[in-house]
Amino acid sequence: MCRDVRGRWSKGLAALSLCATVGVAHAQSSVSLYGLADAFAGVVRTPGSVGNAWEVGSGGLSTSFWGMSGAEDLGGGTKAIFTLESFYRINGGQSGAYNGQSFFGRRAFVGLSGESGQLTLGRNDSLLFVSTLLFNPFGNSFVFSPMVVHTFLGSAMGAAPVQSDTAIDDSIVYQSPEAGGLTASVLYSNAGIAGHVGQANYSANVLYFAGPFSATAAVQSLHTASLFLNGATEQTAWLAGAAYRLQTVKFYLQYERVTNNNELTDDTIQVGLSAQAGTGSILVSWAGTLRRPAQGADIRWSTVVLGYDYPLSKRTDVYAAWRYDTMTSVSSGNSVGAGIRMKF
């Protein structure tokens, strides 16, 4: 903008003054463009499915996305911030992590950040999802993370235990400043329906990082006037997790309970580790879910995953993983894949 003004009005003192003002504003603000591309090739056969199908898939270890974020220094240690991030499927070029997802489905918010914490409004991360991905060795993988798969994906067992996306629309989030390794966040959403307070969604989590030890606790309460996919209208999920690094090995543990007002209950536990092996890392994780329906027999689902992640550079890595599932009364699942992930 300044170069255009100077080129047209190089002899005008007023224009030079304007450019100086704009230059100061630019020096106090910044915008970044970034993202991640992840594709894999392999066979994904979930429990209860029939046959094997080779595929090229998107998001083997991390869901592919691109985004932009910016900040403006308002003085006194306060900044105005915004973030817009969009999932995409690199294997077919479609937008969204799944059909029908909003364009900026990963997150989209604007807010303020300062010494007193951070406040954002828009489509914010589910705080339960944040605590889920940070405390398992496969992170936010919707293909190879047993904890993520058991929590957020439907299966032959029925609807997914947690009936929310990874981000929540029409939400307000406050995150406290870090103190002694501890941060706390709270989320509120009215589900976008004015006057329907009973349909509000609430979420909160705490994160603690100190040396080799880290821990989290999270709760999420969802309400709807219609029916969730599991037939309920109210749902509460509780999660606790911890991790400990012992030299080159990091151990993970998570427990989650999800209750619904139709008496459906899901209990999930995850144990895992990541271990340095040469330049890369061996990843191991197991998750087991016990579903107690209001009627009928209990259902047990077990998933074990073994993987290896090898960095080619600071931004690019290659990986391979094998996943095996068993579930009550259905055929087992057997999946394998290898892929490449690049950050930009």
Tell what function each PLM region has.
Residues 28-43, 54-190, 198-200, 207-211:
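Outer membrane beta-barrel
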Residues 201-305:
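Detector for outer-membrane/organellar transmembrane beta-barrel domains
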Residues 67-69, 109-111, 173-175, 205-207, ...:
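Outer-membrane beta-barrel architecture
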Residues 38-40, 85-87, 124-126, 187-191, ...:
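Outer-membrane beta-barrel pore domains and translocons
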Residues 23-27:
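Sec/Tat signal peptide C-region and signal peptidase I cleavage site
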Residues 41-49, 88-94, 127-131, 192-196, ...:
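Gram-negative outer-membrane beta-barrel proteins
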Residues 332-344:
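Outer-membrane beta-barrel "beta-signal"
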Residues 78-80, 116-119, 181-184, 212-217, ...:
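Repeated loop/turn-to-beta-strand initiation elements of outer-membrane beta-barrel proteins
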